[in-house]
From Swiss-Prot:
Domain of life of the source: Bacteria
Natural source organism: Pectobacterium carotovorum subsp. carotovorum (strain PC1)
UniProt-listed Enzyme Commission number(s): 1.17.1.8
Protein name: 4-hydroxy-tetrahydrodipicolinate reductase
UniProt binding sites for (S)-2,3,4,5-tetrahydrodipicolinate: 160, 169-170
Similarity field: Belongs to the DapB family.
Catalytic reactions of this protein: (S)-2,3,4,5-tetrahydrodipicolinate + NAD(+) + H2O = (2S,4S)-4-hydroxy-2,3,4,5-tetrahydrodipicolinate + NADH + H(+); (S)-2,3,4,5-tetrahydrodipicolinate + NADP(+) + H2O = (2S,4S)-4-hydroxy-2,3,4,5-tetrahydrodipicolinate + NADPH + H(+)
GO MF, one annotated term: NADP binding
HAMAP family per record: DapB
Taxonomic lineage of the native organism: Bacteria, Pseudomonadati, Pseudomonadota, Gammaproteobacteria, Enterobacterales
Length: 273
């Protein structure tokens, strides 16, 4: 085991993302796996977390309750479902544990709960932990300021057949970045579905299109289309390790923060560019 003062707990340790988070923790300096959790009733409870991730024995047994590992971790990483994440948030808030939240699909009440908890604990909450995606969001701001007022803006995203929310959290973050740069409210200008006779396109709208198919890890494109030319800014992920590495990097960063709500822009200092 690596010597480290930053102990990370992974929720959903047996899932695709959970296993890659465990691999990322093993590969990265400055962190160590402190705890691994699975949902109540999972057949993986009692398994060795390292073996689940294909790393060999780690000595960390998968548990079903945060109470059982309360003293074993400093930062919790959660890429699960909103209802589960909010329960984990309440625990981390109560016990003053930092949190990395990669879960998407929260309603306004869920987002408010995260914001409130961040008054007392450090939280990095992001729709996407890929370095490349967050650089793309910065580029979208720049493009929107230059050409967003006279182009048609469309966002197209594609993910694997098992993804349960649409549009993706990343696609929504792209829309928010563009809308903010243009002084628009995404809630009032977003168009999520077109069918039948829709009429002419509203020039102030931001359209979204969603694909769910096969094993696509994640593809996102923002299109700024004018008459005679268009600019497309695209990010394609070929492995979930890019998200896992970003989340662990965020865990290292948040470990020095007593409280506050942050995103990957803060972790990567993108606002300084």
């Amino acid at each position: 085991m690596k010597n480290s003062s930053i102990r990370i707990a992974v929720v959903g340790a047996g899932g695709r993302m959970g296993r890659q988070l465990i691999q990322a923790i093993e590969q990265m300096d400055g962190v160590v796996l402190g705890a691994a959790l699975e949902r109540s009733g999972s057949s993986l409870i009692g398994s060795d977390a390292g073996e689940l991730a294909g790393l060999g024995k780690s000595g960390i047994t998968v548990k079903e309750s945060l109470n059982a590992v309360q003293n074993d971790f400093d930062i919790l990483i959660d890429f699960t479902r909103p209802e589960g994440t909010l329960a984990h948030l309440a625990f981390c808030h109560q016990h003053r544990k930092g949190m990395i939240i990669g879960t998407t699909g929260f309603d306004d009440a869920g987002k408010a709960a995260i914001k409130q908890a961040a008054q007392d604990i450090g939280i990095v909450f992001a729709a996407n932990f890929s370095v490349g995606v967050n650089v793309m969001l910065k580029l979208l701001e720049k493009a929107a300021k230059v050409m967003g007022d006279y182009t048609d803006i469309e966002i197209i995203e594609a993910h694997h057949r098992h993804k349960v929310d649409a549009p993706s959290g990343t696609a929504l973050a792209m829309g928010e970045a563009i809308a903010d740069a243009l002084g628009r409210d995404l809630k009032s200008c977003a168009v999520y579905a077109r069918e039948g006779h829709t009429g002419e396109r509203d020039p102030k709208s931001i359209g979204f299109a969603t694909v769910r198919a096969g094993d696509i890890v994640g593809e996102h494109t923002a299109m700024f289309a004018d008459i005679g030319e268009r600019v497309e800014i695209t990010h394609k992920a070929s492995s979930r390790m890019t998200f896992a590495n970003g989340a662990v990097r965020a865990a290292i960063w948040i470990s020095s923060k007593e409280n506050g709500l942050f995103d990957m822009r803060d972790v990567l200092s993108l606002d300084d560019l």
